[in-house]
Amino acid sequence: MGLKLNISNDLKKSGFMLRQSLLKTSVSNFLSLNASSTMSRAFIRNPKFYSTSSNDTVLYESKNGARIFTLNRPKVLNAINVDMIDSILPKLVSLEESNLAKVIILKGNGRSFSSGGDIKAAALSIQDGKLPEVRHAFAQEYRLSHTLATYQKPVVALMNGITMGGGSGLAMHVPFRIACEDTMFAMPETGIGYFTDVAASFFFSRLPGYFGTYLGLTSQIVKGYDCLRTGIATHFVPKHMFPHLEDRLAELNTSDISKINNTILEFAEFASSSPPTFTPDVMDVINKCFCKNDTVDIIRALKEYASNTSALAEFAKSTVKTLYSKSPTSIAVTNRLIKSAAKWSISEAFYYDHIVSYYMLKQPDFVEGVNAQLITKTKNPKWSKSHEYHFKDLENYFKLPSEYNNGISFAAKGRRKTPLWNYKTYPYL
């Protein structure tokens, strides 16, 4: 990609595999993100989105060995704001060093785990000339997601209801991702002129075949048991059992990842009466089409399926229509990001997210997409580019901006300065 990362030798040592306990090694010394770049798609100075008290927007509970964070903005589907991140991060850092805290549990109050951040407020702030503030807010969200991705104690995400965007970023990189019957998982960014960030590129590139590329480009929602079938979730537990699972995890009083896994299995379901949405035939089409490096070739391959009389023609037609509704820049950048991330470490994925975010927030599709989808609600954004993108045309989106020449830092303040835990393969289970 023509870009060298200024990463220490410790960071280059990837593939570290976690065995019985996440406590064996310490984490920190992150790649750190400079103040002009960091994230939460929730908002900053706007009082509607910037809570004056974090105590009620994030509930914190200590229950035996469990430390439980409940996102508590049910009226806005637990959309994440800056105060919430500022409440969660210091506690996570402190708990990482605590001998009493054994397992972290993340959950959402009401019918949503988290719908992500407030992109409407971000777009309005950009229009008001506050792009640096938006970048700073976005970077805070990356910092939280990276902290969870490299956390040295087991984390369990109870993905009730809507789990999307930045909310997905809280869950996708932790070792235990528990779906239930009403889970709705998605990264919907290509429909608003942005890209699949929070290192979703790392996660998606490690799902079976090219299913992750399909999810990233189409913003497809994956529901319920399909989350387990496709690898998005590690377990499926009926929602009414969540409180009982939480109690059992607290009683364990251990950070042994195998014991935690076995405990979750006590509550898990291993079969579903609902048929799979993504059948082997559908997956075959996805793999044959979304393996292409250029989005124009992906669309061409789908059109070939759409033109025949097979049972898969309707799926292909629908997918082409979906892709044409997305920002051409967004799907092209997302495609390249996910394909490239297959070779990256987790921290490299976050690093490039900061760089790509810098450029994507500058280009007009983000404000246009958010305006059409969420403000005027015309649902018909006028994208700035055509679909004639090629892989090589996207090089500039991955070049370090000159104002970041002093480096990109997304360290969580206060984490110990020991070698960064970095990996290319998820070190769980």
Curated annotation (Swiss-Prot):
Annotated GO CC locations: mitochondrial small ribosomal subunit; mitochondrion
EC code(s) of this entry: 3.1.2.4
Pathway connected to this protein: Amino-acid degradation; L-valine degradation
Entry keywords, A to Z: Branched-chain amino acid catabolism, Hydrolase, Mitochondrion, Ribonucleoprotein, Ribosomal protein
Residues the record lists as binding substrate: 141, 166, 189, 197
Gene Ontology biological-process entries: mitochondrial translation; valine catabolic process
MF annotations from Gene Ontology: 3-hydroxyisobutyryl-CoA hydrolase activity
Keyword Flavoprotein assigned: no
Reaction(s) this enzyme catalyzes, per UniProt: 3-hydroxy-2-methylpropanoyl-CoA + H2O = 3-hydroxy-2-methylpropanoate + CoA + H(+)
Entry annotated with the keyword Coiled coil: no
Subcellular location: Mitochondrion
Broad EC category: hydrolase
Family of the protein in this entry: Belongs to the enoyl-CoA hydratase/isomerase family. Mitochondrion-specific ribosomal protein mS47 subfamily.
Complex formation: Component of the mitochondrial small ribosomal subunit (mt-SSU). Mature yeast 74S mitochondrial ribosomes consist of a small (37S) and a large (54S) subunit. The 37S small subunit contains a 15S ribosomal RNA (15S mt-rRNA) and at least 32 different proteins. The 54S large subunit contains a 21S rRNA (21S mt-rRNA) and at least 45 different proteins. mS47/snr1 forms a protuberance of the yeast mitoribosome and retains a solvent-exposed cavity likely capable of accommodating a substrate, in accordance with it being an active enzyme as well as an integral constituent of the mitoribosome.
Function according to Swiss-Prot or TrEMBL: Component of the mitochondrial ribosome (mitoribosome), a dedicated translation machinery responsible for the synthesis of mitochondrial genome-encoded proteins, including at least some of the essential transmembrane subunits of the mitochondrial respiratory chain. The mitoribosomes are attached to the mitochondrial inner membrane and translation products are cotranslationally integrated into the membrane. mS47/snr1 has enzymatic activity in vitro, and is able to catalyze the specific hydrolysis of 3-hydroxyisobutyryl-CoA (HIBYL-CoA).
Protein name listed in UniProt: Small ribosomal subunit protein mS47
Gene: snr1
